[in-house]
Amino acid sequence: MGKSKFERNKPHVNIGTIGHVDHGKTSLTAAITKYFGEYKAYDQIDAAPEEKARGITISTAHVEYETPARHYAHVDCPGHADYVKNMITGAAQMDGAILVCSAADGPMPQTREHILLARQVGVPAIVVFLNKVDQVDDAELLELVELEVRELLSSYDFPGDDIPIIKGSALAALEDSDKKIGEDAIRELMAAVDAYIPTPERPINLPFLLPIEDVFSISGRGTVVTGRVERGIVKVGEEVEIVGIRPTTKTTVTGVEMFRKLLDQGQAGDNIGALIRGVTRDGVERGQILCKPGSVKPHKKFMAEAYILTKEEGGRHTPFFTNYRPQFYFRTTDVTGIVTLPEGTEMVMPGDNVTVSVELIVPIAMEEKLRFAIREGGRTVGAGIVASIVE
């Protein structure tokens, strides 16, 4: 079968498998490709290549498949640490997740941790695959495990009572040994994923935002800021705000340039130069953003979920304590911040993931789910995501 070209006519959704080690995440991924994509065997997926995201090495396997309704990009990680890093750095963006839980074991520590991470990094929806049901003879026991999973999801503010739970066996699907818990369950799972995981809003439909990378002054024309449009559209003549680092100011975009050509608008993904009215060369700087007025506010204090690199990953060699003051790299610039550890946590070791509170020395344009790198003198020592804004 020849390689079919990527069909753009279906909505595209990014998903991934999460759950405890050995509960069957990779087998399930293989089983889904068997019925909905180009079949990838367990070993092909398990030998996940390493990639770098925000200076951190992560092993992730990517597979693609499609249902009649959608095209999916699916990520599966070999090790628990890879999941933690992946979800925090957003190396593989997840619009939804399939939580794989063994019916024989029920929820285990990493089941809980992955649900917590999904909550912290803002995975919008979860569908559950209760795997290895052929290892449980007792229907009541199966019901008990399902109840446990629902309670666990609810305890992390997911709608545990409404989340679809599909019971089956990834192995039965791979081995064609029992159609009901094999192929049928996989098809039922994907129908649930189609129905329950919402299609993400395309970046172009969101309010305009441009992280400023550079500032120039062009004699006779004024000040130009450059960068890649993160989301939305900006049209010539529109009013925008400059947010972050200094007090918010309003200006008007009087021109948009791309590859030295004048355009009437710039949109998500474009690298543009935007000419802005009435702003001097030193009235704007790298690290600020241009955005639709009122859409983004500057903040200093936030709660973050962070992963701290190990020594082997090029990170710190020693733990850190409350009042640790690294730089936080948001979009295009470093800002110093003061870290406060949660009550009862005395120190954070390299390799830990942790929820901390941060206060920056200057405000930065930020929203929940914004990702950042933690740096010391230009060297990445961690990665994080804004879990919630305090002020």
From Swiss-Prot:
Region G1: start-end pairs: 19-26
Keyword NADP: no
Catalytic activity entry: GTP + H2O = GDP + phosphate + H(+)
Binding site for GTP: 19-26, 76-80, 131-134
Keywords per UniProt: Cytoplasm, Elongation factor, GTP-binding, Hydrolase, Magnesium, Metal-binding, Nucleotide-binding, Protein biosynthesis
Annotated tr-type G domain residues: 10-201
Gene3D superfamilies linked to this entry: P-loop containing nucleotide triphosphate hydrolases, Translation factors
Main localization (coarse): cytoplasm
CDD domains in alphabetical order: EF_Tu (cd01884), EFTU_II (cd03697), EFTU_III (cd03707)
ATP-binding found in the keyword field: no
Protein name: Elongation factor Tu
Species whose genome carries this gene: Rhizobium johnstonii (strain DSM 114642 / LMG 32736 / 3841)
Lineage of producing organism: Bacteria, Pseudomonadati, Pseudomonadota, Alphaproteobacteria, Hyphomicrobiales
UniProt gene name: tuf1
